[in-house]
Amino acid sequence: MMNQMGMHMQQPGVVPGGPGGPVGMAGGPVGGVGVSPVMMQSPQMQQQQQVAAQQQQQQQQQQQAQAHQQQSQQTEKVDNISKVKGLVGPLRDSLSTTVKTAAQLLQQNNLNDAGTKGGDMSTTTPRFDKHLEEFYSICDQIELNLKTAKLCMQQGASSQQYLPIPVAPTQPNPAETNALSYSQYLDVVKIQIGYAKDIHDTLICAAQNICPSE
């Protein structure tokens, strides 16, 4: 009996543990298999990794959206009206330079006619014709862009009048089911051109029949 009681007595500083064996005072398993704290934290680590991956995907999507917006803005700036707006500044500078050059040449010619020296002869005479040609070149570019914009507006109005069905771009939106594709639009234009040619030929034949040539 004394031996059995001694076997059941607890050792000092040791408390009985579970299936893994006795547990010490610090709470760690003694002589048994415990659960690693890394394994206990693995679900939290997985959640953090998933959140980080989602944030990276969102950042990539935002960057792609910003790049798409920049490309669309660059393509929008290519139209004729934007070109005209961009040429207004160079036109103003060219006009100012041309007027200043003309004033310098007039002053120099006045001094030459009066028989006085026009300052330092080593300085080069400003080229009035060059500045004037540059000014007219910018004016021609503005005029050409304005004419092109006017023709585009006229063609757009004619298209809305004679072909009210909207034309889809090269990459059509799936939601726009009542839109023509670009290839269908080209076919319609070819048919209209053929009709116009037939009417033209018919009118010419009728005019020749009314007034036959001798």
UniProtKB/Swiss-Prot annotation:
Taxonomy of the source species:
Eukaryota, Metazoa, Ecdysozoa, Arthropoda, Hexapoda
Q: Give the quaternary structure.
A: Component of the Mediator complex.
Membrane-spanning residues where? none
Give the protein's recorded name. Mediator of RNA polymerase II transcription subunit 29
The record describes the protein's role as: Component of the Mediator complex, a coactivator involved in the regulated transcription of nearly all RNA polymerase II-dependent genes. Mediator functions as a bridge to convey information from gene-specific regulatory proteins to the basal RNA polymerase II transcription machinery. Mediator is recruited to promoters by direct interactions with regulatory proteins and serves as a scaffold for the assembly of a functional preinitiation complex with RNA polymerase II and the general transcription factors.
Composition bias (Low complexity) maps to 44-74
Q: Which family does it belong to?
A: Belongs to the Mediator complex subunit 29 family.
Q: Where in the cell?
A: Nucleus
Primary subcellular site in the record, as a coarse category: nucleus
What is any Pfam family matched here?
Med29
Alphabetized GO MF terms: transcription coregulator activity
User: Which organism's genome codes for this protein?
Assistant: Aedes aegypti
Q: Which GO terms describe its biological process?
A: regulation of transcription by RNA polymerase II
Q: Where is the composition biased (Gly residues)?
A: 15-34
Q: Record's Gene Ontology CC terms?
A: mediator complex
